[in-house]
Amino acid sequence: MAKYEILYIIRPNIEEEAKNALVARFDSILSDNGATVVESKDWEKRRLAYEIQDFTEGLYHIVNVEAEDAVALNEFDRLSKINGDILRHMIVKVD
């Protein structure tokens, strides 16, 4: 199984309940498509290097995942591009 790290930035003005629901939804997208979520945690609220959609700060969230193939990662990638609460995301394969 390959190991991946996903980092995504959530808009800073989101309510706590909505943020928790968003994180749970995207964790379930990964697990429903065959990946195993090893760890999913909030990192911190950080200042962005440049404005993204008029925001200068963002809530960083890190997810460590194990997956056999790229199906779950592709679905995560597709849906995170559509979602307005996620400002940016990055998927990296861990050696």
UniProtKB/Swiss-Prot annotation:
Coiled-coil segments: none
Transmembrane segments: none
Keywords of the record: Ribonucleoprotein, Ribosomal protein, RNA-binding, rRNA-binding
Cellular component annotations (GO), alphabetically ordered: cytoplasm; ribonucleoprotein complex; ribosome
Superkingdom of the source species: Bacteria
Biological processes per GO annotation: translation
Gene Ontology terms, MF aspect: small ribosomal subunit rRNA binding; structural constituent of ribosome
InterPro entries for the chain: Ribosomal_bS6, Ribosomal_bS6_sf, Ribosomal_S6_plastid/chlpt, Transl_elong_EF1B/ribsomal_bS6
Zinc-finger keyword on record: no
Function summary: Binds together with bS18 to 16S ribosomal RNA.
Family to which this protein belongs: Belongs to the bacterial ribosomal protein bS6 family.
Name of protein: Small ribosomal subunit protein bS6
